[in-house]
Amino acid sequence: MNQTEWIIPCNPQSYNLQAALTNSDEVYWRQNARYEIGDIIYIYLSKGVSAIRYKAIVIRTDIEIKSEDDPYWIDKTMQSQKLQKVLLKRIKTFNTALLSYDLLKENGLKSTIQGPIKLKGSLRDYVNRIDQNQ
């Protein structure tokens, strides 16, 4: 199996991921790309943070679960969506400015992070280097 690395966005004004990961290392996430079990997911917190804060691994895919059961939604309109989910398990929490949007952009990020992005080339090399040194 070929492992893919992704950056995915999380808007902390819509979903309280920090609280969710305080209570458990596992979180259900919208399956809006072709994630496979074993893929690595770097979670980028947008508004107010603008940096990668978490590294997770996909442990299950194609899950049907009601978002209403998730108490960490701030934006209740998003909570009501019925979407396929994946189960992510947190591997690491980052507390470094080295994974900020500006430095990601300087190291190969070509666009804003509004959806899943496959890590490739110089951006992948940069994120992996910071990850290994944290």
Locate predicted features.
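Contiguous surface segments at macromolecular interaction interfaces
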Residues: 1-8, 14-20, 24-30, 66-134
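Short coil-to-beta transition motif at edge beta-strands of beta-rich domains
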Residues: 32-45
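Short, flexible loop/turn elements at secondary-structure junctions
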Residues: 12, 47, 60-62, 92
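Short beta-strand or tight-loop elements
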Residues: 37-39, 54, 84
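Short, charged beta-turn/beta-strand-edge "cap" motif at the junction between a beta-strand
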Residues: 45-51
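Short beta-strand-centered aromatic/proline hotspots
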Residues: 52-61
